[in-house]
Amino acid sequence: MAKHVRMHQLQKLTLRSLPPASVLVSSSRCFSVLNRPPPNYEGHIPLTRTERLGLALGSGIGSFLDPQRGDLIASFGEATAQPYFIYKLRDRMLLNPTGRRILRDRPRLTSTSLDIPRLRNLPPNTVGYAYAAWLDREGVSPDTRAAVQYIDDEECAYVMQRYRECHDFYHALVGLPVFREGEVALKAFEFANTGLPMTGLAVFSAFTLKKAEWRRFWDIYGPWATRNGAQSDDVINVYWEEELETDIDKLRERLGIEKPPDLRAMRKAEREARKKEKETKGTMVGAAT
């Protein structure tokens, strides 16, 4: 019964959010490169279906070949998120009390709004301290997230912006670093949790990992990401600004997320093991001669 009620609520929310059919038909008939409609919000760039397809293909191939191109990853994320996936993610926020508050308040995650110096002075077990420490360790800033341009619906554009700005909190929550191996693992988690196509494409870059990295992803981090992303609560519904002084272990427990093995420590241990093995072989060769 509860499942039917939930589905009914979701249908009402989806129908309420869609524009009238007459508007859809009219805009479809008139929209072309030479007759582009006005933007729906500041910075919005309306695209035709052909333009959106071209953007998705070009940015998708480019970001697969060079995962460091954040601009291409952002463009691919927007080009593939609508008309379906970003609406589904928005509807999951609407069905959650905290998600609805986030959509109403429209908070932004920046170095100014978060007061990073204050977070550095919080107790070490808090979310805020872990987030600031992760930023410092990885050398990144919350102010580098690109503004959304290609999502047509203004509310859904905010959902995509919120997802981008929360990404570093996901890193800090699970302790994964920013280099490729860590990003692939986190993107796999995000794909299982959010369903956004861009995060799924990023998982395919696992095929570009080195042999040892691929083995770790296949044996450890891939299964961890799939299991935890699917079983945990929707991380898009976390009001991070209100959780900064929360114990990070308790937040993971509340969300149903297991912390994965320390990737940096694992890589370091493997490097030291290889170094020791190499030194041992060198000693044996020297003794033999």
From Swiss-Prot:
Would you name any one GO CC term?
extrinsic component of mitochondrial inner membrane
Subunit structure comment from the entry: Component of a multi-subunit COQ enzyme complex, composed of at least coq3, coq4, coq5, coq6, coq7 and coq9.
Coiled-coil annotated spans: none
- Main EC class the enzyme belongs to: lyase
- Which species expresses this protein natively? Pyrenophora tritici-repentis (strain Pt-1C-BFP)
**Its EC number(s):** 4.1.1.130
InterPro entries linked: Coq4, Coq4_euk
Q: Which family does it belong to?
A: Belongs to the COQ4 family.
Leader sequence range is none
Localization terms from the record: Mitochondrion inner membrane
Cofactor(s) in the UniProt record: Zn(2+)
Task: Tell me the Gene Ontology biological-process terms attached to this UniProt entry.
Answer: ubiquinone biosynthetic process
Q: Where is the composition biased (Basic and acidic residues)?
A: 266-281
Q: Which domain of life is it from?
A: Eukaryota
Protein name according to UniProt: Ubiquinone biosynthesis protein coq4, mitochondrial
User: Catalysed reaction(s)?
Assistant: a 4-hydroxy-3-methoxy-5-(all-trans-polyprenyl)benzoate + H(+) = a 2-methoxy-6-(all-trans-polyprenyl)phenol + CO2
Pathway assignment reads:
Cofactor biosynthesis; ubiquinone biosynthesis
What positions does the transit peptide occupy in this chain?
1-31
Residues reported in the UniProt entry to bind Zn(2+): 167-168, 171, 183
